[in-house]
Amino acid sequence: MKVPRLIVAGTESGAGKTTITISIILKLLANQMKVKPYKIGPDYIDPQFHRLASGVPSENLDLWMMNDDQIRYLLIEGSREFDISVIEGVMGLFDGAGSDFTGSTYDLARRTGTPIVLVIDGYGISATAAAIVSGIKAYAGELLRGVIVTRVSGESHYRLIRDAVEEKTGVPVLGYMIRNEKAVLESRHLGLVQAYEIDEIREIFGAIDSSTVIDMHQIIDIARSADKLETLYSPEIERLGTFKVSVAMDSAFDFYYEENLRMLKRMGASIRYFSPMGNEVPDADSDLIYLGGGYPEVFAGKLQSATDTIEAIRHAASIGTGVYAECGGYMFLCRSLESTDGHIYGGVGIIPASVYMDASLVIGYREISAKRDTSILRAGETARGHEFHKSRIRFDGPYDHPFVLKSRSSSFEDGFSSGSVTATYAHIHFLSNPRVAENLLIA
């Protein structure tokens, strides 16, 4: 299948990938094109910016949580009703699991035949940009189809970089972004701020758009040159019945993989969103309450005041309604929760544990295996996901955790499971094991 697409990659984190991705999306929309965004890697936050810019959900593509055929499947299925797909890379172009580039943005590009547009930071350099691009071209080869330069001081600065790069490397330079303090995406303790928390986000997007000059004809031509995608993969998903799933969705809880929600729907779930921040309650006849990750530690005071939400979740758990929580949702279910400013607030209280904040970030891929039967995995079953948090959970007494999380260098116990309630720090991608979604609905 022909899927016009390109990858926006960077020389490093902070080069401006997200900003340029947003700019390209906005300019394609202005050209009356339907745009489908994707993000390489497990990150939840960049896709929120993509969604706000494009108006449609952005999906994650990850070579550790998925195999090649699943990646192609997501690209084919997700792009069917769109004119072009824009895929934002992760870290630097070649940064992955090792020196062979496994799991990197480049790795996904070569496995899917997707052309690359490279973003380089032009601040403080001119002809040196040619050496940077030359080195990257030596590894990326013909997949490298263009360059966009960020943080240039003006058009004359841009021309110096453009002329050097094109003369020395033969790689076309497609445009630039002027330094503009109004076109900056803010940051927070875990990375980029959640998109809808930024004040006047539309004004920021407008500043990004007006600060960038990009040859969109070349962008479109590059995307249309991408290899055809073929796959025999189709997830073995059957409709299991009719289910009601209540999903927490607001500024405290909004880290969900789009494919996870879609898989639940394919199995027969109708999804209704509720806001703990707004003291809303899940449907009383829910078969499952799904509490995803987010930033409950930032909003702990307001969440403590959400007494209707808290009581509804407690009641649901007491009558055997399925409750599944990941990371931030896991924290919210605990007895107490420390906020980012050091205050202690009450949580739902169905997990006998307290949450405290730590200076160090826990981050990385995880293989999760069940030590005993739970509502997401039966004993011995495994799935894949990742962790990304600064909090820690301390149980009130000795507790036999239901899961073992394995990283590249170690393994450790995690999570909570009792009755119909299951929680883990891991953000699991259901495509790594569709049994997770099935178990949740028929538990």
Curated annotation (Swiss-Prot):
GO terms for molecular function: ATP binding; cobyrinic acid a,c-diamide synthase activity. Residues 244-435 form the GATase cobBQ-type domain. GO terms for biological process: cobalamin biosynthetic process. Its cofactor is Mg(2+). It is an enzyme of class 6 (ligase). It catalyses: cob(II)yrinate + 2 L-glutamine + 2 ATP + 2 H2O = cob(II)yrinate a,c diamide + 2 L-glutamate + 2 ADP + 2 phosphate + 2 H(+). Its EC number is 6.3.5.11. Keywords: ATP-binding, Cobalamin biosynthesis, Glutamine amidotransferase, Ligase, Magnesium, Nucleotide-binding. Gene3D superfamilies: 3.40.50.880, P-loop containing nucleotide triphosphate hydrolases. Disulfide bonds: none annotated. The active site is at residue 327. The keyword Protease does not apply. The record marks 427 as: Increases nucleophilicity of active site Cys. Pathway: Cofactor biosynthesis; adenosylcobalamin biosynthesis; cob(II)yrinate a,c-diamide from sirohydrochlorin (anaerobic route): step 10/10. The a and c carboxylates of cobyrinate are activated for nucleophilic attack via formation of a phosphorylated intermediate by ATP. CbiA catalyzes first the amidation of the c-carboxylate, and then that of the a-carboxylate. NCBIfam families: cobB (TIGR00379), PRK01077.1 (NF002204). Comprises of two domains. The C-terminal domain contains the binding site for glutamine and catalyzes the hydrolysis of this substrate to glutamate and ammonia. The N-terminal domain is anticipated to bind ATP and cobyrinate and catalyzes the ultimate synthesis of the diamide product. The ammonia produced via the glutaminase domain is probably translocated to the adjacent domain via a molecular tunnel, where it reacts with an activated intermediate. Catalyzes the ATP-dependent amidation of the two carboxylate groups at positions a and c of cobyrinate, using either L-glutamine or ammonia as the nitrogen source. Belongs to the CobB/CbiA family. This is Cobyrinate a,c-diamide synthase. It comes from Thermoplasma acidophilum (strain ATCC 25905 / DSM 1728 / JCM 9062 / NBRC 15155 / AMRC-C165). The lineage of its organism: Archaea, Methanobacteriati, Thermoplasmatota, Thermoplasmata, Thermoplasmatales.
